[in-house]
Design a protein with these regions (language model features):
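Interfacial loop-to-transmembrane junctions
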Residues: 422-441
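Alpha-helical transmembrane segments in multi-pass membrane proteins
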Residues: 42, 297-305, 328, 332, ...
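Transmembrane alpha-helix termini and helix-breaking/packing motifs in multi-pass membrane transporters
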Residues: 388, 450-461
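Alpha-helical membrane-interface segments at transmembrane helix boundaries
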Residues: 284-296, 300, 312, 316, ...
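Non-transmembrane, extramembrane segments of multi-pass ion/lipid transporters
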Residues: 132, 258-290, 341-365, 420-426
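Juxtamembrane "helix exit" motif at the C-terminal ends of alpha-helical transmembrane segments
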Residues: 302-319, 382-392
């Protein structure tokens, strides 16, 4: 019973038995495998495929049609370097048919991870219409609106009658990414309006599309950054957004499922950078590869930390006179780093969601500095009380408490201001990672602490 439970992959409501599916394939019980596998959700199918070894994957290709494989390939979440080896195990004709049957944007996402030779081979084997469509999309940068759009949408000329439009929608629906939003174009294929399926259904049959459509169209330029597009779609609560070129020609659409992927990707990327690592989602990396990705940041921070160590060493005289000062170094530097990291997270989040503009930058910095000051005063007073009670040294307590207050105030301000400066310079603010801010704040807090201690040394001895 325990073994059976271990072999079950559960996604809240859906349950499938991986071992049983594997056994069906290995026993060549094709009908049983197809019945169970094709009855699963495409997400579960992709999970099963990702968790399978090469032998099982090869059997899957043998018993499923390219159309059936294409359905769950839409959901695959492999690392970039895993796609080439995967396609090496597939027959070239079979692989090209799989890509043909995928939505164009998802097919392009996969092809962007393949070698140029494989892409050229796939395009040669695909039918001309699909190959032409995918070639056009491959020209766009991956992280732009053009890179995530699909060309499978429904558009209507403004001079089309509603009754004709309904027939057109019915014909195009099977291949369209969405039918709920329909775009109106003029004779030059320029975007001039938008209407919903509901608008079309309730309109009079003899009305023209230009009479039904809304001319207030919000669109994305093909070169817009995907993060900006995601923010715009979230602001307007769209399920689909048209993508146009610089002359307003309709090129494609971006749907909400693509935007959810973008938001997840951007959030993971920002989180990775804040943590000082290259990719928190690299679940298949070896320990050596993981270490290799993290070492550049760690080596940089090691050298930055040497500045802190050198700084503390330069105050050797002060430490030799009052050795107890050394006991509070971790508190001062740690709290300064903690407050800076909190402020950094808030600042980066506000920048990424578009909450900060030119007018509000000063207010954000002022608010964070005020928050740091209040937190610093409270923590400083508590620390003063503890030192007085434990060590009976009010002057030392005042120096440590005052340093903590100043360090937390400056640390919080640094955490807020550095991302704002980076954003102003068009540098991703998430690069100002937590470890980086912490190390910078260590240097500043030690300057404050030992500077104040040295200044008031005559009162300590």
């Amino acid at each position: 019973m325990a073994n059976e439970r271990d072999n079950k992959y559960i996604d809240e409501e859906e349950v499938y038995n991986k071992s049983l599916l594997d056994q069906h394939l290995l026993d060549n019980d094709i009908d049983a495998f197809r019945d169970e596998f094709l009855g699963m959700h495409t997400y579960e199918q992709s999970e099963y495929f990702e968790d399978s070894d090469d032998e099982i994957r090869q059997r899957i290709f043998e018993v499923l049609s390219p159309e059936e494989v294409a359905d769950f390939f839409e959901q695959l979440e492999f690392e970039e370097e895993e796609y080439d080896p995967l396609f090496d195990t597939m027959n070239a004709n079979y692989a090209s048919k799989v890509l043909e049957n995928m939505s164009s944007d998802n097919a392009v996402d996969i092809m962007n991870q393949l070698s140029k030779q494989k892409v050229a081979s796939m395009l040669t084997l695909m039918n001309k219409e699909d190959a032409k469509e995918i070639k056009a999309l491959l020209h766009y940068e991956e992280d732009t609106a053009g890179g995530i759009m699909t060309t499978e949408y429904i558009s209507l000329k403004v001079t089309t009658l509603v009754k004709e439009a309904l027939m057109h929608v019915k014909e195009q629906a099977p291949d369209a990414e969405t039918i709920y939003v329909i775009f109106a174009v003029n004779d030059h294929k320029q975007l001039v309006g938008v209407l919903s399926l509901r608008d079309l259904i309730v309109a009079e049959n003899d009305a023209y599309i230009e009479d039904v459509m809304s001319e207030r169209v919000v669109s994305a330029n093909v070169a817009d950054d995907q993060e900006d597009v995601a923010q715009k779609m979230r602001d307007y609560d769209f399920i689909a957004m048209p993508v146009v070129d610089y002359q307003d020609h309709l090129l494609g659409i971006i749907t909400i499922d693509d935007i959810l992927d973008v938001m997840d990707e951007e959030a993971s990327e920002d989180y990775s950078r804040l943590a000082g690592v290259s990719d928190v989602n690299a679940k298949h990396d070896s320990v050596f590869k993981t270490a290799g990705k993290r070492l550049p940041w760690l080596i940089t921070l090691t050298f930055l930390s040497m500045i802190t160590a050198t700084l503390i060493g330069s105050f050797e005289d002060t430490l030799s006179k009052v050795a107890l000062l050394g006991a509070f170094i971790p508190i001062i530097s740690g709290m300064s780093g903690n407050s800076g990291t909190q402020s950094l997270a808030v600042s980066v989040r506000k920048i990424s969601t578009g909450e900060i503009n030119e007018q509000s930058k000063f207010l954000v910095a002022l608010r964070e500095a005020g928050s740091g000051l209040i937190s610093g005063v409270v923590c400083g007073i508590l620390l003063i009380i503890c030192i007085v009670v434990l060590h009976r040294q009010p002057i030392l307590a005042t120096i440590v408490g005052g340093s903590l207050t100043a360090a937390m105030t400056v640390g919080t301000l640094m955490g807020a201001v550095i991302p704002l400066i980076m954003n102003k310079l068009n540098i991703d603010p998430a690069v100002a990672s937590g470890p980086f801010i912490t190390t910078i704040n260590d240097i500043i807090s030690m300057l404050i602490y030992f500077g104040l201690a040295t200044t008031l040394m005559s009162y300590l001895i």
